Amino acid sequence: MENVNTFLEKVLYMEEDRGIADPPLDSLLSRSGSKYGLVIYAAKRARQIDQYYIDLHEGSFYAHVGPLVSVDADDKSLTVAMREIAEDKLDLKSSAAE
């Protein structure tokens, strides 16, 4: 009976799949000055993450910084970039000055 209860707890409290709406766009916009700035910054970071995986595959480890948040195997680089922004792993203010 204990195994059944443990299984039910895992099913009931299982984390839902995250998608493009998680993190919520409103919280992302509060970290950025504008929609345009958020889109540009997230796209640049997604390209860096893609390049990191390419470099990793080719054996070069130090050219780009990899993901700063936990990543699932099926996560897209843009989703990872958005999560990094939502969790304050990146400084959007300094990038606006560049």
UniProtKB/Swiss-Prot annotation:
Lineage, top-rank taxon, reads Bacteria
Q: Which gene encodes it?
A: rpoZ
- Role according to the record: Promotes RNA polymerase assembly. Latches the N- and C-terminal regions of the beta' subunit thereby facilitating its interaction with the beta and alpha subunits.
GO annotations under biological process? Answer: DNA-templated transcription
Give the source lineage, highest ranks first: Bacteria, Bacillati, Actinomycetota, Actinomycetes, Micrococcales
Coiled coil spans: none
For this protein, the record's Pfam families field holds: RNA_pol_Rpb6 (PF01192)
- Write down the EC number: 2.7.7.6
Looking up InterPro entries in the UniProt record yields:
DNA-dir_RNA_pol_omega, Pol_omega/Rpo6/RPB6, RPB6/omega-like_sf
Q: Which GO terms describe its molecular function?
A: DNA binding; DNA-directed RNA polymerase activity
Q: Which GO terms describe its cellular component?
A: DNA-directed RNA polymerase complex
Q: Which reaction does it catalyse?
A: RNA(n) + a ribonucleoside 5'-triphosphate = RNA(n+1) + diphosphate
Q: How does it assemble?
A: The RNAP catalytic core consists of 2 alpha, 1 beta, 1 beta' and 1 omega subunit. When a sigma factor is associated with the core the holoenzyme is formed, which can initiate transcription.
Question: What PANTHER family does the record point to?
Answer: DNA-DIRECTED RNA POLYMERASE SUBUNIT OMEGA
Q: Which keywords describe this protein according to UniProt? A: DNA-directed RNA polymerase, Nucleotidyltransferase, Transcription, Transferase
Gene3D superfamilies found in the cross-reference section: 3.90.940.10
Name the family the entry cites. Belongs to the RNA polymerase subunit omega family.
- Kindly provide the name given to this protein in its UniProt entry: DNA-directed RNA polymerase subunit omega
